[in-house]
């Protein structure tokens, strides 16, 4: 009976969570999504702070934090070169920023105690747990690959829409709309589902049981960051080379 009572209580607690509640800032005539900005600033501060500490005294033979960040940079370079080709150099900062921001954002949802910070409405969570963030990242990626294609080929870039035959014009146009949609909803859906599963399990069972799920969530969060960055690089490479 106690188990049943605890289970029902957990379900009641979960049902009481506010869904769709947000904390807004009123700036002029606009409503600004305060939750996403706060958590995004925290993630940016973590990235900038850790990088500044790691490379504040660079050594010829790297050690410690400098060695770790150089390894991360090499990894991002490899991903960029594989997907973009020999002209990958200028795009390493963009791909690296996407990967690191998404990676730290995803992990912050599991590792940082956002819940202890009380807001008038809603609650804090990972930035990528909000569709506004993932859509913004996907739109930035779209702008990037259009810019890459137009910079490389000029207006002839738009000739891709009638290749290999003009009959495919509607499909080729639709493809450019589905790319940001798939990027944003894939990332948002995976992170949201992971956090919801952990919340439900923590409410229903003892703390030790959800721990394996939390570790699995950390793994999948890293994979999602890699997938997003890899696809962004692939789209940029595709726009520059003109192949599908």
From Swiss-Prot:
It is a multi-pass membrane protein. InterPro entries: ATP_syn_F0_a_bact/chloroplast, ATP_synth_F0_asu, ATP_synth_F0_asu_AS, F0_ATP_A_sf. One of its GO terms (cellular component) is proton-transporting ATP synthase complex. Keywords: ATP synthesis, CF(0), Chloroplast, Hydrogen ion transport, Ion transport, Membrane, Plastid, Thylakoid, Transmembrane, Transmembrane helix, Transport. The chain crosses the membrane at residues 35-55, 92-112, 131-151, 196-216, 217-237. Its main location: plastid. It holds the Pfam family ATP-synt_A. It comes from the Eukaryota. Disulfide bonds: none annotated. It is found in: Plastid, Chloroplast thylakoid membrane. One of its GO terms (molecular function) is proton-transporting ATP synthase activity, rotational mechanism. F-type ATPases have 2 components, CF(1) - the catalytic core - and CF(0) - the membrane proton channel. CF(1) has five subunits: alpha(3), beta(3), gamma(1), delta(1), epsilon(1). CF(0) has four main subunits: a, b, b' and c. Key component of the proton channel; it plays a direct role in the translocation of protons across the membrane. PANTHER family: ATP SYNTHASE SUBUNIT A, CHLOROPLASTIC. Belongs to the ATPase A chain family. This is ATP synthase subunit a, chloroplastic. The gene is atpI.
